[in-house]
């Protein structure tokens, strides 16, 4: 995973953007929109195919996003299609595109001025256009009717990372980009083979070029291509379809991800932000969801705090957790902003400032900065800049997350669920603690026992946080529990000047104007897993701030002596990553993979997993930054939709990952 550079542009006399990197225009100086419609939409027979399509979601792949012209054009046509054919089976359009040098937002907005008729669509894209962070960015538009997966990076690196199942992924390919003579590195057999691997059996493909090597290369990859009349004065272009696709997948057998075979009735066990985000994401897809919450209302557990910081957990040069949390954080921003249009909850994108408060923390943050993340995501501040940014005296440098901030997780969670309760697809059962799950193989249903009653569902998701051990199917998952206490301190005139969330060996939020208190925390206690007030933790929360900023007097104004606080128990993992996906059968896997270290990949059978049982656990203390994207991952998996993360990153989230790692090394998994 390498850093991303924005496109370097010039503008010609016609007002068309020209790439400095490739010395080529992004679209035709004359009738660029009409050419897009002719080459990519009409030659892929999209209006006709949409009418006859027998699935809920149609997936388009594109090899060069550029200004987004093709995406905006097909979005406009799909909107007209939905209006004209409201009863059609096809409800959603999914667009997967790649871009090595993404335009800056300013350049994107300028380019979009060329097409006034697309303005309503362009403005929505601009609103959620992502920062230049590598790999996949999912943008959900029109309440899920339109989804854009925008992959930033070289297509030769990104395309092999796109997850796909045996039946393929793409229904239509837009083979676009700068001319082959201008960008020969992209137009090669590896590209054509990659397109074929992602294609479904009935996939079509169209491209503006008539170059012989392109037609021959696509034919060799498995497409049947032919020359057709080009647009306007262009004599020819090529178009075709997949001739014969072999069934294959790029998921490793021991990290297999399978969709639900029946998601007519989905049960979610839990009541926190994970459950709420997942329920919203599934209902958006037209799924019937029932929530089972052991408490009288949502967000009574770890999701019940007044203020929680939202910022990405990053490490080194774009490795490990960064590949989950960087796009996860950006998606969380999108999710929260969209939720705020429908429900009320306290939040403020005021930024996050993380202090270099001692040598160890400074070294850690410098190593993180070595990853060359875009300044839109994170950048360093001097001590003077830090003081100006936070609004209070400070004598140390920091890193700043300008897109970060805080929100009230309790209000967000409850608001999401209350909104869902107004729909016909969702039901919440409070004070229903699920005691057991039993699978009926003959009927292909799960039976949930709660409150002395039995409930049946075709698919179940366990999202009950620190309660995961109460169900036998998830009891062996290698996760831990940590108690946390957050202290609430009243505002003072000085503390009210804090303008950003402040992180050190703890964190402090700005004053919430709606209750005139700030939050400071949070403790980590593995030995007392209860919800009782802890006086020592209360004192320690305040003392950490004084200890980390010994030269400042304002820190002593933080008064926690009123013992205002909240306790919760986090569900945590050793590698700081959530557990999202199919639940493995622990006892069977021990036998099935007893000799895994001596087997070749092609000889290994798919890992044994409980049918139609999934988990969404281990969010730890960064759940607000990861839960929305993890919900999108799991909902996509359950419904068989394209997945929004690289296939190798998905292995890092697989619920059986720690068992498999040990078994591949020949180690027992009885103790983890």
From Swiss-Prot:
Summary of the function given for this chain in its UniProt record: Catalyzes the last two steps in the biosynthesis of 5-methylaminomethyl-2-thiouridine (mnm(5)s(2)U) at the wobble position (U34) in tRNA. Catalyzes the FAD-dependent demodification of cmnm(5)s(2)U34 to nm(5)s(2)U34, followed by the transfer of a methyl group from S-adenosyl-L-methionine to nm(5)s(2)U34, to form mnm(5)s(2)U34.
Protein's name in the database: tRNA 5-methylaminomethyl-2-thiouridine biosynthesis bifunctional protein MnmC
GO cellular component, one term: cytoplasm
Stretch list, region FAD-dependent cmnm(5)s(2)U34 oxidoreductase: 269-672
UniProt KW keywords: Cytoplasm, FAD, Flavoprotein, Methyltransferase, Multifunctional enzyme, Oxidoreductase, S-adenosyl-L-methionine, Transferase, tRNA processing
Main location: cytoplasm
EC number: 2.1.1.61, 1.5.-.-
Localization per record: Cytoplasm
Catalytic activity annotation: 5-aminomethyl-2-thiouridine(34) in tRNA + S-adenosyl-L-methionine = 5-methylaminomethyl-2-thiouridine(34) in tRNA + S-adenosyl-L-homocysteine + H(+)
Family (UniProt): In the N-terminal section; belongs to the methyltransferase superfamily. tRNA (mnm(5)s(2)U34)-methyltransferase family. In the C-terminal section; belongs to the DAO family.
The UniProt record lists the keyword Zinc-finger: no
Alphabetical list of NCBIfam families matching this protein: MnmC_Cterm, PRK01747.1-2, PRK01747.1-5, tRNA_MNMC2
GO biological processes: methylation; tRNA wobble uridine modification
Cofactors, names only: FAD
InterPro entries: FAD-dep_OxRdtase, FAD/NAD-bd_sf, MnmC-like_methylTransf, SAM-dependent_MTases_sf, tRNA_MAMT_biosynth_bifunc_MnmC, tRNA_MNMC2, tRNA_S-uridine_synth_MnmC_C
Pfam families associated with the record: DAO, Methyltransf_30
SUPFAM superfamilies: FAD/NAD(P)-binding domain (SSF51905)
Recorded GO MF terms: flavin adenine dinucleotide binding; oxidoreductase activity, acting on the CH-NH group of donors; tRNA (5-methylaminomethyl-2-thiouridylate)(34)-methyltransferase activity
Taxonomy of the source species: Bacteria, Pseudomonadati, Pseudomonadota, Gammaproteobacteria, Vibrionales
Signal peptide: none
Annotated coiled-coil segments of the chain: none
């Amino acid at each position: 995973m390498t850093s991303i550079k924005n496109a370097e542009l010039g503008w010609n006399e016609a007002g068309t953007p020209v790439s400095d990197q490739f010395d080529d225009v992004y679209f035709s100086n004359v009738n660029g929109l009409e050419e897009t419609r002719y080459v990519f939409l009409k030659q892929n027979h999209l209006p006709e195919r949409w009418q006859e399509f027998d699935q809920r979601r149609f997936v388009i792949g594109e090899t060069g996003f550029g200004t987004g012209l093709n995406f905006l054009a097909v979005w406009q046509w799909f909107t007209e299609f939905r209006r004209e054919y409201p009863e059609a089976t096809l409800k959603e359009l999914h667009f997967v595109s790649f871009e090595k040098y993404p335009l800056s937002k300013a350049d994107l907005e300028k380019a979009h001025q060329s097409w006034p008729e697309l303005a309503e669509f362009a403005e929505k894209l601009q609103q959620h256009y992502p920062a230049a962070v590598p790999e996949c960015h999912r943008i959900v538009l029109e309440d899920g009717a339109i989804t854009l997966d925008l992959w930033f990076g070289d297509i030769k690196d990104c395309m092999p990372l796109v997850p796909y199942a045996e039946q393929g992924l793409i229904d239509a390919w837009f083979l676009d980009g700068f001319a082959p003579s201008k960008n020969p590195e992209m137009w090669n057999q590896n590209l054509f083979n990659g397109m074929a691997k992602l294609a479904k059996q009935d996939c079509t493909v169209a491209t503006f070029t008539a170059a012989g090597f392109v037609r021959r290369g696509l034919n060799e990859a498995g497409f049947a291509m032919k020359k057709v009349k080009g647009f306007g004065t262009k004599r020819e272009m090529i178009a075709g379809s997949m001739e014969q696709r072999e069934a294959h997948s790029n998921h490793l057998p021991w990290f297999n991800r399978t969709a639900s075979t029946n998601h007519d009735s989905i049960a979610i066990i839990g009541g926190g932000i994970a459950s709420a985000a997942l329920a919203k994401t599934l209902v958006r897809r037209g799924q019937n969801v029932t929530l089972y919450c052991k408490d009288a209302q949502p967000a009574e557990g770890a999701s019940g705090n007044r203020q929680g910081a939202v910022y990405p957990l990053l490490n080194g040069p774009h490795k490990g957790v960064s590949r989950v949390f960087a796009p996860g954080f950006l998606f969380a921003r999108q999710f929260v902003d969209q939720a705020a249009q429908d429900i009320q909850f306290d939040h403020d994108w005021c930024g996050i400032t993380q202090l270099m408060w001692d040598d160890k923390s400074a070294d850690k943050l410098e190593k993180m900065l070595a990853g060359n993340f875009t300044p839109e995501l994170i950048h360093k501040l001097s001590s003077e800049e830090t003081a100006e940014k936070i609004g209070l005296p400070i004598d140390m440098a920091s890193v700043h997350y300008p897109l970060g901030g805080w929100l009230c997780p309790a209000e967000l969670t409850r608001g999401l669920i209350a909104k869902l309760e107004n729909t016909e697809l969702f039901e919440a059962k409070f004070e229903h603690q699920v005691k057991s799950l039993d699978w009926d193989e003959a009927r292909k249903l799960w039976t949930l026992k709660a409150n002395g009653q039995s409930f049946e569902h075709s698919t179940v998701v366990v999202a009950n946080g620190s309660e995961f051990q109460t169900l036998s199917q998830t009891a062996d998952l290698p996760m831990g529990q940590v108690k946390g206490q957050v202290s609430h301190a009243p505002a003072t005139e000085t503390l009210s000047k804090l303008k950003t969330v402040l992180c050190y060996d703890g964190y402090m939020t700005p004053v919430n104007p709606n209750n005139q208190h700030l939050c400071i925390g949070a403790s980590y206690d593995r030995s007392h897993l209860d919800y009782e007030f802890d006086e020592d933790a209360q004192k320690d929360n305040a003392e950490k701030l004084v200890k980390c900023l010994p030269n400042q007097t304002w820190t002593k104004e933080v008064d926690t002596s009123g013992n205002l606080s909240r306790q919760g128990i986090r569900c945590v993992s050793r590698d700081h990553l959530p557990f999202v996906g199919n639940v493995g059968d622990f006892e069977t896997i021990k036998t099935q993979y007893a000799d895994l270290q001596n087997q070749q990949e092609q000889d290994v059978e798919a890992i044994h997993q409980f049918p139609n049982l999934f988990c969404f656990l281990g969010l730890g203390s960064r759940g607000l930054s990861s839960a929305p994207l993890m919900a999108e991952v799991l909902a996509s998996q359950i419904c068989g939709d394209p997945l929004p993360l690289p296939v190798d990153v998905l292995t890092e989230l697989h619920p059986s990952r720690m068992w498999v790692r040990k078994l591949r090394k020949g180690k027992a998994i009885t103790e983890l």
